Amino acid sequence: MSLVKLFDTLAFDAWNPFSIFGTTVAADAWLASDTSAFANTYIESRETAEAYVFRADLPAGVKKEEVRVEVDEGNVLVITGERSVRREEKGQRSHHIERSCATFFGRFHLPDDAVVDLVRASMDGGMLTVTVPKVVTDKQPAIAAAAPVPAVVAPAVEAKAIEASP
């Protein structure tokens, strides 16, 4: 009887000195965490009465030039970003260079009432906000016709003169 399962693929993997209990640990954790935070950017979307709003909390140090917002295929909002990190250390007997590149993107199909020509994007403190306004309509929502409400008639009140007492 073997302790290794016949089809256990992890049993046949080559030994990796940076692997601890099945998870890979980067040799230089600061570079990996910075890159993975950028690549795993979450884009939140919500709808208001006037617009569709998309927000992304980007990692510290991301520049406006690294983020791109565009409308593709008529009604698809595309938010992309690319970041490259290069680290170089020169010693007396060594020269060490590390490079890392990460990208993120989000594609959102916009409804027919989105005005794609007026898309606005702003970035403040690492928070990217993209606003897509809606078409303004002057129509009021139709109120369903209901049965007429009967008029309430108050009973007649007799007018009595109030006599002044002496």
From Swiss-Prot:
SUPFAM superfamilies: HSP20-like chaperones. GO terms for cellular component: cytoplasm. InterPro entries: A-crystallin/Hsp20_dom (IPR002068), HSP20-like_chaperone (IPR008978), Small_HSP (IPR031107). One of its GO terms (molecular function) is unfolded protein binding. Induction: Not induced by heat shock. Its main location: cytoplasm. Keywords: Cytoplasm, Stress response. Residues 34-152 form the sHSP domain. It is found in: Cytoplasm. One of its GO terms (biological process) is response to hydrogen peroxide. It holds the Pfam family HSP20. Belongs to the small heat shock protein (HSP20) family. May form oligomeric structures. This is 17.9 kDa heat shock protein 2.
